[in-house]
């Protein structure tokens, strides 16, 4: 498998896409004072507690500092805890996070169905490439 390099921050993606988090908890640091304002990781979300924290952080306009693509902060092996969850389990939990954080349910539904359609299209293309 290839490597995934996460970089940059595009906080506007939060409004129209579930895949807005361009960070991994390995390379993510917050001051204690910010945790006191936005809260800690919500362990109610089994595979996406970091996603929930990022969502709350961005919604409250805490963007922090961003490194360049050349600066390696952490190296994460594949096969971690969240990789045991399916695409749809992740998607359902991300949907619950949005609703829990009071995002408009109509917009959340649109983003949800858009993610499903994109996944189906990607799967279709993958099958078509094999033929």
Residue ranges and their predicted role:
Residues 3-90:
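Conserved nucleotide-sugar donor-binding catalytic segment
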Residues 92-95, 99-131:
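Membrane-proximal basic amphipathic "stem/tether" segments
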Residues 1-3, 77, 116-122:
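Short, solvent-exposed polar/charged micro-motifs at secondary-structure junctions
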């Amino acid at each position: 498998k290839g490597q995934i390099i996460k970089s940059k921050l595009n906080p506007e993606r939060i409004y129209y896409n579930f895949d807005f988090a361009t960070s991994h908890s390995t390379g993510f640091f917050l001051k204690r004072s910010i945790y006191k304002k936005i809260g800690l990781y919500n362990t109610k979300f089994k595979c996406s507690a970091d996603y929930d924290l990022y969502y709350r952080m961005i919604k409250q306009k805490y963007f922090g500092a961003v490194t360049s693509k050349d600066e390696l902060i952490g190296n994460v092996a594949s096969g971690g805890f969240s990789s045991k969850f399916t695409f749809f389990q992740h998607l359902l939990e991300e949907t619950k996070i949005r609703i829990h954080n009071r995002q408009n349910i109509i917009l959340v539904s649109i983003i949800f169905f858009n993610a499903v359609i994109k996944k189906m299209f990607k799967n279709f293309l993958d099958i078509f490439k094999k033929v």
